Structure formats: structure tokens, C-alpha cells
């Protein structure tokens, strides 16, 4: 007749719980406030990546208008750009500037030193490509109009020098206006650049202000051309899509839209060889050839010319576009060219054969992955040669924002989490589910000391952070699309190490597809792990010493592998997989058993701390496993025993407490279902030393929707009743522990006494995302420490409710400090210390605290308003290696070596203003003035192929030494002249005065035969 008001409901709750001890211990609202502790992952999808070798920093730009810069361990600095621009290009300059170009052709200059945005420059025309050098202030900007602007990053101004569209003005005036397609600085001479337009490629000299050489690729009728050539009966001019220098700068490569790869001689402009990925001499006419334009072939979209530590040993890495044809998976091709023949003694025919017959070719398939849109080589030897100097890691960027890591040249893919910072682990590959859990502090810290923590990035210095005082640590577990599960320390602001445990179910299941992780359960006291794949296989792991560590496969191993090739061949539900653990892991999470029930997708999984594992399937089956056997002790469909018509189990909780009026405690397994029904089971010892499961009751507890979570606590003390080994051992004493159980439904929370009654009920206006109990230590006015048990509820609208128990009375309503995503917020977790891990997006989660630690008295130094300290990115002690120079042959031909100082004069003029930023003065000390200075600051071994800078002498005393060096080279056999003279090239360059320089050059020419 009358609707029950909220006030009457609160009174009813208070009356019901009046006789029960308030385990929240009178906690009040002043103890609570929200603060974001840290963020895991990235906001948005990655669109661009770039790497700085000297500072060892990696930067990624996302669709959310953010640029993340990563260093060693957990170092991360985020630049948030106004208006969320989409970044197209990004480069590091001098290690201290980060340049970004957005889709509207704005140039954004960021300081790695001050971590500030220095300026934004608007470009009057659309930017099609850019080029920078790690050691120079200048940025070359290719425009849609075909012109090239030169931007002085350090002075924040454009150079007066503007390079015209040479295709239109000089070579092909009748062709339509071509944009600049590609720009590359000469790897040995900053005075020249390689420019490509749609139909022609030129070498331009800053010193002479003119084109020094041009390259025009034209196919005669019936020449096959590349894989995508059409109209072969006509003369064609395939458009250029990219051009590259050979690391020695003596040859170039032009890449064309028909997949032609054309090698040219820089000095003469002569075509050396034209090929495609698989075919050679594709520029030679063949009248018998038929038009193959209907043959579907993936188009090349990017090529990198990689070199080993000795830059004369090179290879090509070629990426092709994805097609819709499933029979043509996207691939990356490696063409290993091997050592480059000596230019001075190799004919054009011999050089053509060199490019036609590489040492080897490999195809790296990307089958099953999203389309590849870009790749980034990560060099180990120097920042030069286009960032391709001695790389064994290639970072692949996929269309969906995922990152893959290609081991080069082996061709295998590595998703090893510790290689890069934890935030990038969310996209290597995509996280499919995540949970967070509280772990005993000493146990956790001991376990994490042996976790993998090696990192490719070495840059940056972590900021000093305040350590929060908690008796527990927080573990973050992420499941990924490739079947891997990673276990991290969630306390990002307190732990700077990159330590992570990683397990991979692909090897355990012996499968390459359908591996995505859907459910994870972690027993934090017994260090056991249970995970389920998307097709319903459940894999059990335990933290232990690996008995197969370091073992090589035995002679009968092949037969064993064949017999276990597929789990589908197994006739039993439980499959022993203890021999499928990694042999290179001495101690860690080792697989033990797979539950291969063939029941379809898993709806719920719980690995208890007392050795029992419960697995619920969408089709209704509930399996309970005792890991001590292992043995299945229960296997039934809950649809048979449900009283309310439940279809499947949605969540499981194991606890030790009194059931009804038993007078003693029991192991209870509480199962929530899809319609809000609570099903109670007892786990009892059986006569044969095993355990048995007894169904006791089923009660409809929540209004609507599935049950999201179940928790329990003792009525008298407020401590958790979750099942542990110590509580299980105490059962023999017959002690009764009266307890409450909290059940979270779609939009309500019910508190019940198992086997007795439904007690308090709380209803919320918005649906519940997640909820849980937290156990908060409080120092009262007398200085006494007491425990306050509270219920924290996160709603999907961003409200955070703090409730007392058992009354479920609201103490405070807080607003979540991070935006929520309805699609991912259910992957959030409430932790025992008052923290909440909230998944905010596909690639991101945040750790927040609702506890005001200074008010609780547990940490007087805590300041909830204090901002998170920012890491240091730039290290001024690191020197940029000296740039490689032209070799002896180019010097002998008359190539004038251009110094950075001379280039500054050529591009900036003699009236170039003073530096605008302090970054310039800081970076100036990090540019090596000689190779010896560079060698002192760079990793050992990198000086083997370093090029000494010539130093001009004020006197003539060094002239005799130079001539003596030349004469020794002349006496050496001709085939070693080019090799040995490189050692003298820099000695001869600028150490001679004008007269001695001319004399030495004449002698060199006669020695080589010019």
C-alpha cells in the first residue's frame, strides 16, 4: 500500500544489525578522498613510434593526442597536446628535442629536457615527408607542392633557403605538379640530400645549391617491371614511393609503386640493377611476356636498408601492404645482401650480379595479425644510417594499435614483457582481461626478486617517490590475445623495476590460434594460477622450481611430442602438462594440469588458497578440482540443482565460516549465478582421504542480473573469512566463526548469514562495475591501532560509494578521478588496502586510492594533494657519436666534406641568431667534437667502425705525416687500397693546408687509377 522510503530502509537495516558488532569501527568521511596513484598502458591507439639511440628513449604517439616517452624500468613522461591532434611523423633531434608533425601539418617541438612543449609552427602547405639527423638542428620538410622548406629547430625559424620542385622546373615540366615523396640525408655527407618526386629522384648539394645527379626509371615496352606492372606493351614510368642511400653512400635504391627495386650508382647516375622481391632484371624487355596485371600481389609500402656493425654488410627489410585475399597473408621480406664489393675494383656487371643474387632471402609472415602499417628498426651501434645501424629488434606497428617485436634476422616474434616498459605491455599484444589482487608483502617481495627485469631501453632517471605504508602489496595480472599472462607489481609509484612474471599458454596447449585469455584467478598465498582460454581450456600453474630447467630434448622426445600434439586427442578431462614448461626458466609459474572439459567458454574461475579450483562454463557445468591429486571432486550442471532457473555460475568464493546453526565452521563454496541466485556448497573430508562436495542450499539474493562478486568477513572481528591454509587447519579444533557474506548484483548489494537469513540490502541508482571489501588500519585518538572493514562500490557512472558493514550505510560518495569506459570497467578490482585498479580503456588502466592516509594516522607524511613526481628523461652526460664521413674514394673524386658548422652557415646564414632555447646550450656539450670523445661515452665495441673527424692544423708540420700515409697506401696491393685508405681518410681531409691537400689528392687519384 505504501512504498518503502529510503529512510525507512536505512532504519530497517540499522535495526537488523543493531545486535551485531560494527566492524567498520565508527569510520567517518574524513578518512576518504580519491587520488590517482598511477596509470598503466596508454590512452588511445598508437599511430607513430620513434627511437633515440643516444638517450635510449622510445616515444609513441596515440590517437588521444598524447605522446608517451619511455626510458628504462618504469620511466614514462606523457605530453598531452591541445585539441588531440593526430601525429603523422615524429623524430628525436640531438636527443633533447622531440619533433612531431600532425595531420594538419603543424610542427610541434617538445623538450625532452624540460618536458615542456616549446613551440608549435604552422606550415603553409601540406607536409608529405620529413627528414632529420640526430646531430643537427635542421629539419627538412617536403611539401605537397614539391618544394622543400628547412626549419631551424633550435632558433625556431625557417631557413631562407627553399629547395624548388626540380621535377617540375628542370626535368619534367609537362608533368603535373608532384609532391615531395621522400627525403634522406646522405649518411656520409650532410652537405647532400636525396630527394624523390613521383617520377624522378635527385641528389641535391647544399654547398653548390644545385642538383648533382638525377635518376629516372623508365620501362621499355615488354619489360616486366615490378610485380604490379600493367600495360607492359607500352613504355611506362612507375612512380617512386621511396628512395634510400646505401650506408656507404655510393649507391642508392629507388622503390616504385610497381614493386620495382632499382639500384643506382651515385657518381654516374647509371642504373646498376632493377629487381622485384623475387624477380631480377625486371627492366629488360621480353617480347614473349604476357600481361600479368590480374595477378594479385601485395604492394611494397616501406623499405629500410639495414647494416651490421660494419656498415658494409647490409640487408633490405621490405614491408608489403595487407590484402583481402586470405591466401596472401601480409609478410615482411629480408634480402640479405652480405658484404658490399669494393667499389674501386668492381665492375657494373659484377655489382648487378651482387644485387641480383643476395646471400639469402627470408619471409616473415604476419598471418593472424592485424595489418602492418609501419616498422621501426632499433639500432645498437649508432644513431646514424637512418637509424638502421646494427639492429636485432624491429618494432612493428599494426593497424589496431598493437606492437609486435621482430627478432632480426632470425624472423621470430617476441612478446617478452620485460623488454619494454609495462605500459607498452598493454599493446604487446592487446590485453583481453585483467585483475588485481592483494598479496602478503614479504611473500610478494621475495617472489618478485627472481622475476625477469631486463629492458632494452636504458635511458632516463626515475623520480624519487613516496612509499606508501601497506601490509600488503598489489599484484596486477593481465591476460593477452596471444595466450600470455603477465604478473606485475601494481604499485607503479613505489616500484621502479620492470620485473614481471610471464606464462605462455600457447606452448602448453600446443596451439597457435584461439589463445586469447578470458579469465584469470590467482591464489596469492599458495602462489597458484588458473587461466582460461577463449575456447574453454583451463590451464593451472604453480610457482615452483622447474624440474625440467636446462634439459635438452631426449631421443624419444619426438615421439612424445607427436603423441601429445593436440589436447583434443586426450580422452580424459585432466591432462598432465608439467613437461611443457619452459626449459629456460629456473623458477617461476610452471604449468601442471589442463582441464580440457570440451564444454565451451568459461563463465567463472576461482583458484582458492586451499588447493581447490572451481570452473564454471557458460553451458552450465560446474567442475571442482582438488589440485592435490589432481582430482575432480565435483562435475555437474547447475541447471539441474538450481531452484530459480539459473543457467551458469558467474562468480565463485571460497570461505571458512559457520553455516547456519552448525556450531562449527566448514569450508563453504559460494557460487553466484547469472540471475542473482546464491548457491552454497560444503567441501567435506571423505573417508578415502579425499574431499567431497555437498550441495546445501540455493537462494535468490539479488534483484536482477548476474552476481558480480562475493566477499565474506567475520561478524566479531571484521577480518576476512576467505579460505586460507591456516583457517583450514583450524577446522580440526571445531571453532565456529560466525560470518557475513556480501553479494554484489547488477545494481544492489545483499548481506546474508549463510544458512540463516538475508540481512542488509543496499540498492544503487546506477549499475555496479565492481565492489569489494577493504580492511583499513586506523590510529584512533588514543594512539591505538584498530581495523576498520568497509565495502567499496564502483558504479559505472563514476561514483565510488564507501559503505560501513554490516549496515551497508554510506559513509562517503566520491567521484572517480579517471574517466570510465562501460566496455572495460568490469575488469576493475577493489583491493584490501583501499586501492582500486580501474580498467579505463582497451589499452589502459589506472590505480587510484580512496584512502586519506594522513587522516587515518597510518602515514603522517602522506599528502593526498601532492602531484606525482615526473621522471627525468634527458641525461647530459651521454654523448652523440660523431657522424660517419665520406670514404677515401669519394674524397679522391673531389667530394667536399661539409662540417655541421658549415651547414649552419649555409642554411642559417652568417647572421643566424642566437639559440632561442636553453636546450641548445645543453645539447651542444653532447655533440662529440671527435670520434675519440664519442667513444668515451658510447657502449664498448661501437668504436670499431667509427670515423675520426678531420681537424685542421694551424701549421705545416703534419704534411709529411700525411704524405707518408699516402705513400704507404700506394705501395699496398690495389684490391686493398680502398679498405686501408679509409683509415687515413680523415687524417687527410682537413689536416692539410691547401697546397698539401691538393698534392695528396693527386697522388691518391694516381694510386686508384683515375
From Swiss-Prot:
Acts as an allosteric regulator of polarized exocytosis by promoting the targeted fusion of vesicles with the plasma membrane. Involved in maintenance of ion homeostasis in cells exposed to NaCl stress. May be involved in the targeting of the myosin proteins to their intrinsic pathways. Multicopy suppressor of RHO3. May also participate in the maintenance of cell polarity and bud growth. Coiled coil: none annotated. GO terms for cellular component: cellular bud neck; cytoplasm; plasma membrane. Gene3D superfamilies: YVTN repeat-like/Quinoprotein amine dehydrogenase. InterPro entries: Lgl_C_dom, WD40/YVTN_repeat-like_dom_sf, WD40_repeat_dom_sf, WD40_rpt. PROSITE patterns: WD_REPEATS_1, WD_REPEATS_2, WD_REPEATS_REGION. The keyword Repeat applies. Residues 932-958 are annotated as: Disordered. WD repeats lie at residues 47-80, 87-122, 127-163, 182-215, 240-275, 299-364, 372-407, 431-504, 518-595, 602-637, 649-700, 709-763, 768-815, 829-852. PANTHER family: LETHAL 2 GIANT LARVAE PROTEIN, TOMOSYN, ISOFORM C. Belongs to the WD repeat L(2)GL family. Keywords: Exocytosis, Repeat, WD repeat. One of its GO terms (biological process) is exocytosis. It comes from the Eukaryota. SMART domains: WD40 (SM00320). One of its GO terms (molecular function) is myosin II binding. This is Lethal(2) giant larvae protein homolog SRO77. Interacts with SEC9.
